[in-house]
């Protein structure tokens, strides 16, 4: 069992994310065959990028620096690795790139699409209760917590778009519970996830991928620099 992200070999990270993305893509593909008309957002329009969006991502990048500083001061980054520091740093960079790409694809794209198709079906089963809960409580609450940044998606589009955002975001949070096992970590993941949704829907999925990678690079590089690297000597056989 790995205690932190940097302990996971880069190849294992790739395998884990590829498996998750493949499963989500298969589910979305099957659902599209059955209920494509419920997909109320042009998913292909998300696959774009706007460099201006990276400038608008400064709040979460500043927050990443503050979060990394807090982890450093509390001793959370006081770890030991039996590897050279350059190896740890290179793995931190590569892992950050993978996290940014795969998590945005899985949670801001595939999970979002799955939620938009499934929610009308679940609402039909519950005879409108699900939609009533979203429109009466969850959407207004999310609108307030995001200071209206997602108003165009949560309040002024078909209800499944806003509900899809609110449904997919906890899936992202659940995937990050291991990083802290605390309420603070869950709240952090919730708000960061919503900011990344905002970036993806306003500036494109590729923009949110880059911002997400930089966010994680700040955290992982700080962790790699703070950690103690214990050099291991290779044993030579006697001549």
Q: Which residues make up each language-model segment?
A:
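Juxtamembrane helix-loop-helix connectors linking adjacent transmembrane helices
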Residues: 4-18, 34-106, 110-157
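A generic, lipid-embedded transmembrane alpha helix
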Residues: 20-34
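Context-gated lysine
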Residues: 23, 40, 80-82, 226-231
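Transmembrane helix-loop-helix hairpins at the membrane interface
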Residues: 89-239
């Amino acid at each position: 069992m790995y205690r932190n992200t940097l302990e996971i070999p880069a190849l294992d990270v790739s395998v884990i994310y590829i498996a998750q993305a493949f499963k989500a893509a298969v589910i979305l593909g099957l659902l599209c065959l059955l209920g494509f008309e419920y997909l109320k957002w042009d998913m292909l329009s998300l696959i774009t990028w706007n460099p201006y969006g990276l400038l608008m991502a400064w709040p979460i990048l500043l927050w990443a620096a503050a979060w990394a500083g807090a982890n450093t001061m509390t001793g959370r980054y006081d770890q030991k690795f039996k590897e050279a520091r350059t190896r740890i740093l290179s793995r931190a960079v590569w892992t950050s790139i993978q996290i940014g790409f795969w998590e945005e694809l899985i949670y801001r794209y595939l999970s979002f699409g799955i939620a938009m198709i499934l929610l009308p079906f679940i609402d039909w089963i519950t005879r409108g209760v699900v939609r009533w809960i979203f429109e009466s409580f969850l959407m207004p609450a999310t609108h307030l917590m995001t200071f209206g940044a997602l108003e165009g998606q949560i309040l002024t589009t078909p209800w499944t778009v806003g509900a899809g955002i609110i449904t997919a975001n906890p899936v992202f949070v659940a995937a990050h519970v291991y990083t802290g096992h605390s309420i603070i970590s869950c709240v952090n993941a919730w708000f960061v996830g919503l900011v990344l949704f905002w970036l993806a829907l306003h500036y494109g999925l590729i923009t949110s991928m880059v911002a997400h990678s930089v966010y994680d690079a700040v955290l992982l590089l700080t962790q790699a620099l703070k950690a103690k690297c214990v050099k291991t000597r290779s044993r030579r056989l006697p001549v």
